[in-house]
Amino acid sequence: MSILRSPFRLIRSPARFFPSLFHSSCNQSFTNGLKHQSTSSKAMPVSAFYIPSFNLFGKGCLAEAAKQIKMSGFKNTLIVTDPGIIKVGLYDKVKALLEEQSITVHLYDGVQPNPTVGNVNQGLEIVKKENCDSMVSIGGGSAHDCAKGIALLATNGGKIADYEGVDKSSKPQLPLIAINTTAGTASEMTRFAIITEETRHIKMAIIDKHTMPILSVNDPETMYGLPPSLTAATGMDALTHAVEAYVSTAANPITDACAVKCIELVNKYLKRAVDNGKDEEARDNMAYAEFLGGMAFNNASLGYVHAMAHQLGGFYGIPHGVCNAVLLAHVQKFNSRDPRANARLGDIAFHLGCEEHTAEAALDRISQLVLEVKIRPHLVDLGVKEKDFDVLVDHAMKDACGATNPIQPTHDEVKAIFKSAM
């Protein structure tokens, strides 16, 4: 395959050639609260960069993905998806492409918008019954996260709750190929999976080097039919990934470069994609934006926007991207008390195209973008109740994503942020 002549692009990761290096220290960098040192004369600390070993981009790359699955030797796969993907015919298209490569296909299509422990267990039953040697997820973060949970249990055993936190597994998961249909979560290329525990109404954050797909596929043609509301929510999710990664205590020059380019692309193209889903330039660039944001937070991790948003999604069932959109400016206003974070928010203002390069300008532009893409900006409009704050705060403070926030807030401070977003 000639990359220069191909209508799609391929990105390979050095991780496939040096796996011991890329599985060694990145997690330690953010669980220990590693501080950004780009402006210091001290030597940079040892870090690593996680990315799937094989990534496909561009119109028409879906067919190439099927060939790559065949070349990897897989013969019996489970497709994990949701009813919406079935309805629009994308499942049938992928199934046909795989069957052309003599790959047997099984289906689990029960994934919910916030995938649950029950979803994971149902999919796992099919994997065991059919003795699948691989999995393919089709969709956005919900399908990919659910598939990661299934794949992890297929090889490691136990319950999915056993893997909440950071690097709790001991074995690589069942090989997973992730076909992405939204420009936001970047779950097709990260080591993060978020699973809802139905009985406790909380979201469990699983951050594990073994959950990364072996192949990610971003074919913009699969995104053209995405409705405006979902385009807006997933796009704001991508922006949140980039902003949180940039102010993270585990940021490094590589994640910084990915984050700021993501911020620029979202600022330029998200509203266009929301206004006209058939705008190919906007869709293509949002696909790149979400992948860049994924590379940033997959290695620098996140912060309290996600730690808090997970609780809103688990408790009320609010779409994840909407939660992030509403909380992003409020959490960053709190973070701006930290001098380093304040300066970095000024950088973000520059990349958002603001005339003034200040934290305040960045927050104003973020709030403006939320309105431009027609997301309701207040939690009260989404059904959030102040009487639930204490429970939400308790769970947010236990969320692994908060470990790299610029400031570790108190219970009362997290509660105040929730209140400010009402």
UniProtKB/Swiss-Prot annotation:
Induction trigger: Induced in response to zinc deficiency.
Catalytic class of the enzyme: oxidoreductase
Primary location recorded for the protein, binned into one broad class: mitochondrion
Reported cofactor(s): Zn(2+)
Cellular localisation: Mitochondrion matrix
Annotated GO CC locations: mitochondrial matrix; mitochondrion
Entry binding sites for Fe(2+): D237, H241, H306, H320
GO MF annotations in UniProt: alcohol dehydrogenase (NAD+) activity; ethanol dehydrogenase (NAD+) activity; metal ion binding
An annotated GO BP: glycolytic fermentation to ethanol
UniProt cross-references to Pfam families, sorted A to Z: ADH_Fe_C, Fe-ADH
SUPFAM superfamilies per the UniProt record, alphabetical: Dehydroquinate synthase-like
Protein name: Alcohol dehydrogenase 4
Species for this entry: Schizosaccharomyces pombe (strain 972 / ATCC 24843) (Fission yeast)
Gene that specifies this protein: adh4
